[in-house]
Structures are given as C-alpha cells and as structure tokens.
Amino acid sequence: MSAIVDIIGREILDSRGNPTVECDVLLESGTMGRAAVPSGASTGSREAIELRDGEAGRYNGKGVLKAVEHINTEISEAIMGLDASEQAFLDKTLLELDGTDNKSRLGANAMLAVSMAVAKAAAEEAGLPLYRYFGGSGAMQLPVPMMNIVNGGAHANNSLDIQEFMIVPVSQPTFREALRCGAEVFHALKKILSDRGMSTAVGDEGGFAPNFGSNDECLSTILQAIEKAGYRAGEDVLLALDCAASEFYHDGKYQLAGEGLQLSSAEFTDYLATLADKFPIVSIEDGMHESDWEGWKLLTDRLGKKVQLVGDDLFVTNTRILKEGIEKGIANSILIKINQIGTLTETFAAIEMAKRAGYTAVISHRSGETEDSTIADIAVGLNAGQIKTGSLSRSDRISKYNQLLRIEEDLGDIASYPGKSAFYNLR
C-alpha cells in the first residue's frame, strides 16, 4: 500500500506573476509527488471555481492562501493514510469533501493540485514514468501539437479579435521533427515581422502579438512564414484558430472590433467558412459563444465535416455538458483543461466520453502556466492525439514540449506520431 503520510500546500507564482497553488504529497516509502496548477485568462462561465482570496491589498486580490489552507487542513485530514494508487477513490473523497457542484468551497485549484500530486507520487512509487502510469502498455502515441504563434484577444494587447493563430505540423514522421518544423516556422515569422518593422514582443502563451490590420492579413503572413521555413502550407503544416468567441460576443452579436464588424451567428458562421475556404484551417476552437448553441449548430452543420470544431468554454471539460453536446450534434471535439474540472478522474472521464462518441480530445494548457508538465504525460498516457501548449518560446510552454521529447525517446521504436490521422473526426 502506498499510504499518504504528509501533504503540503503552498502558494507559488504562475507565468503571469499571479499566485497559484502547488502541492507536495509524501508517501510512506519516502516517495514524493509535486504538482502545480495553471490558471486561465478567458474562462468559461461553467468552469469549476478556482478559489482566490479576494484581499485587495495582496496580489490585487488574486492570492490563493485560502486554497492552500484547505490543502493543509481539511483535505490533508481527509486523505491522510489513503492509498495513493487508488486515484478514483481519492478523487471521490475530494469531491465529497467539497460537496458543491462547482468546487467552490475547497476550490478547484486546491483539489487539482492534490489530485495531480497524488498521481505523481504513486507513479514514482510504482517505478513508472507518469505517462505509463496513466496509460499502461497502450500509451505510445505522441500528440500533434497546435502551436500558438500569434496571440490576440485576451492573450495580447493588440487589435486582433481572434485569440490564437496556430500552426499544426502534420507530415513529419516523429514528434521531434514536428517540433523542429514548428520552431523553424516560428523563427521565420519573427524575421518577417522584424523586416516589416512590426512588434516581435510575445503574448501570454509565447506567440507574437503584432498589430495586424485583419485576421486575413495575419493568416496570410503565417503562410509566408511556413513557405520561408521551407515547408508547404496545407501539406506539411496546417492552421488552427481559437476564436474565444465568448470574449467578443455582446448584445447578441459577434463584435470584431479590430475589423469594425458586428455579425449575427449566421454571419459569423459565413465569416469563418470563408476563412476555412481561403486558408488550410483544420481546427477552429470556440467558434461561437458558449451559450449560443443555435450558432454552434449552424457552425457544426456548415463546417463539421471538414474542420475540427473544438468546444472549450462550450464544454469546460465537463461530461454532463459534453453529453448534451454530443446528443445535439454540437461541435466534434473537446478541449481538455484539467483545471476546468478539478480532478484527474473527471478529466479522464471526459476524454473517454469524447472518444466513444467519435469526438477528438485536445489536451490543453492555460494562459497562466507553470513549469509543471503533467499535461504532456496525460496527452501520451491517454493517447489523446493532440496537444495545445503554446508557442515556441517561454519556458512555461517549452517545458511541455521538452517532456514530450523525453517521452518519445523513452518509448523508442514503439513511439508513433499520428499527423493528419489525429483528426479522425473529419474522416
């Protein structure tokens, strides 16, 4: 038995300089697991609640000492002595202790830190890499990365309304080569922007944040960067968008302030369809407001056979909401953010439900990250096939890519890179 003998919660800082929660779990054998939780900027209204202190004079109210206290007191008391290898039972214990639908009492940040740290301790105790502990002998597929090389919206201070413009390397035989492709396109884009006298400062997720005149201009420039790096757009590298449409939906209209447009759901569907016809876009995330299910249905009926339509704010990694979406034919993919739901067990259930329905599951970081690379192990362990973890800069993003390189090396000849086949929802 891998008995838990000590739990320590602490307040640390994330990549934006805001407090977040870290937890150490110590087992009877002396083995320790450590985990830190991320935090989002554009958040869905139905996400599990991250507990903040609200004390204006300290970290502008964003402190997490209350969440840390919960870990060090009642959570510690509830799980002390439990077997760390019994993840489902441990997470169930946390859920019952919290007693709310949205984890607002203990805080999803406190609960997730403990859930992750326990899993890492148990993996270490078992002598297994974390991805192998999660997935067993079937874990051998590396994920296709969606690399955010231009930031807009809530992730940057510029005129772009769409939040993320991503490249997706798909023709490469290995993850290592896919990562090299992404890095080379990233540096080619930097040179293009610099030559034009445009800003090469980066946003929260490590992508560039220049002031383009339109989304069209941004996408055209990315195509130039792909070509400049020696790759073929539409063959070697595809494009992906995260609209984060809930952020610019006001008074029943999609208000693209950067382009001076106010569009209905049908008009915004047309707008996105035009972009998908003009550019090799394989994936669009949050193409409609999280509550605009009629708009989502329009978008899915229009583009769902040729473009991956990912629900982030729409589904918030919640099986109850995902089940409703599947039944209504809304979207064809779910974004998986571990802190949207708050425990590993619930996260894995959402991935499994998506796969059973023929939806893809894209494992994702948050805009406020740490050096914790657990999501890389989840992506491989659960054979998710896709990961979204930022650009090719900032160590909080690179840490996940580097962990995937290590995993691929560890897997050796049995490692596989799915490329275009990761988008099985479009077959």
Swiss-Prot record:
In which broad location class does this protein mainly occur, judging by the first location in its UniProt entry? cytoplasm
Entry's PANTHER family?
Answer: ENOLASE
User: Mind listing the UniProt keywords for this protein, alphabetically?
Assistant: Cytoplasm, Glycolysis, Lyase, Magnesium, Metal-binding, Secreted
In terms of SMART domains, this protein maps to:
Enolase_C, Enolase_N
Q: Which gene encodes it?
A: eno
**Tell me, what is one Gene Ontology molecular-function annotation carried by this entry?**
magnesium ion binding
Write the Enzyme Commission number(s) for this entry. 4.2.1.11
Presence of the UniProt keyword Nucleotide-binding in the record: no
Residues that coordinate or bind Mg(2+): 242, 285, 312
Gene Ontology biological-process entries: glycolytic process
> Which cofactors does the annotated protein need, by name?
Mg(2+)
**Disulfide-linked positions:** none
Q: What is this protein identified as?
A: Enolase
Q: In which pathway does it act?
A: Carbohydrate degradation; glycolysis; pyruvate from D-glyceraldehyde 3-phosphate: step 4/5
**Family label:** Belongs to the enolase family.
Please give the InterPro entries that the UniProt record associates with this protein: Enolase, Enolase-like_C_sf, Enolase-like_N, Enolase_C, Enolase_CS, Enolase_N
Which parts of the sequence bind (2R)-2-phosphoglycerate?
A: 163, 337, 366-367, 388
Q: What does this protein do?
A: Catalyzes the reversible conversion of 2-phosphoglycerate (2-PG) into phosphoenolpyruvate (PEP). It is essential for the degradation of carbohydrates via glycolysis.
Task: Copy out the cofactor comment.
Answer: Binds a second Mg(2+) ion via substrate during catalysis.
Q: Write out the catalytic residues in the record.
A: 205, 337
- Check the record and name the Pfam families matching this protein: Enolase_C, Enolase_N
- What enzyme class is recorded for this protein? lyase
Catalytic reaction annotation: (2R)-2-phosphoglycerate = phosphoenolpyruvate + H2O
Q: Where in the cell is it found?
A: Cytoplasm; Secreted; Cell surface
What the entry lists under Gene3D superfamilies is as follows: Enolase-like C-terminal domain, Enolase-like, N-terminal domain
Spell out the GO cellular component terms annotated for this protein, sorted alphabetically and separated by semicolons: cell surface; extracellular region; phosphopyruvate hydratase complex
